[in-house]
Design a protein with these regions (language model features):
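Solvent-exposed beta-strand/loop surfaces of large extracellular or lumenal domains
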Residues: 24, 92-105
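Bacterial N-terminal signal peptides that target proteins for export
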Residues: 1-8
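A mature extracytoplasmic/lumenal domain signature
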Residues: 59-61, 124-128, 139-141
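Hydrophobic helical h-region of N-terminal Sec-dependent signal peptides
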Residues: 9-14
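Acidic/polar low-complexity flexible segments
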Residues: 76-89, 129-167
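C-terminal segment of classical bacterial N-terminal signal peptides
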Residues: 15-22
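Acidic, glycine-rich flexible loop segments
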Residues: 99-130
Length: 167
């Protein structure tokens, strides 16, 4: 994943968005078929056990491994600001995952696995989170090849605010 995880103009929109109340585990939510991109988010799921957080993302259409570019913006303290990112991408002919702070410093490894031709899972250590947090998911499609997330090149879910995850 050559692109930094800080390149989100959408983060500014989220800061002013309302925060949803805490929910139970495991949880799925859906996003409408609302963008004309290969990575149009459909169903997003979060789950956890004693050691790991697992996110599953499904799109409306099939996608190749080389198109994988998913980012979860995570707010650990409920202030409506992203504290770090978990990401799944494609590098050196393989799927890879990582967890980084907002300045691209790696905080931990993440494991990516293919679920089917429309879905992947990303797992990382639960130690990186507190008792509860909230997140949003972004799927990017670099249509102009500049390795940046430009307007019109991504789908965001939820469309406003964050989705809660109670541990």
């Amino acid at each position: 994943m050559k692109r930094g995880l800080m390149t989100f103009s959408v983060a500014l929109l989220l800061v002013a968005s309302p925060i949803a109340p805490a929910g139970a585990q495991p949880v799925s939510f859906t996003d409408p078929d609302d963008v004309n991109l290969p990575l149009d988010l459909k169903t997003l799921t979060h789950d956890h056990n004693d050691s790991a957080i697992t996110y599953t993302v499904e799109t409306y259409d099939p996608f190749a491994d080389s198109q994988v570019d998913f980012k979860w913006g995570i707010d650990k303290n409920g202030d409506g600001k992203v504290d770090f990112f978990a990401a799944a991408g494609y590098e050196d002919k393989a799927l890879e995952g990582k967890v980084e702070d907002t300045k691209d410093k790696e905080l931990g490894k993440a494991t990516v696995r293919r679920v089917n031709d429309r879905a992947i899972q990303l797992s990382f250590s639960r130690k990186l989170l507190g008792a509860s947090y909230q997140y949003w998911v972004m799927a990017a499609t670099d249509t102009n090849g500049n390795e940046e997330d430009d307007p019109g090149e991504f789908d965001l879910a939820p469309d406003a605010g964050f989705h809660p995850h109670q541990l």
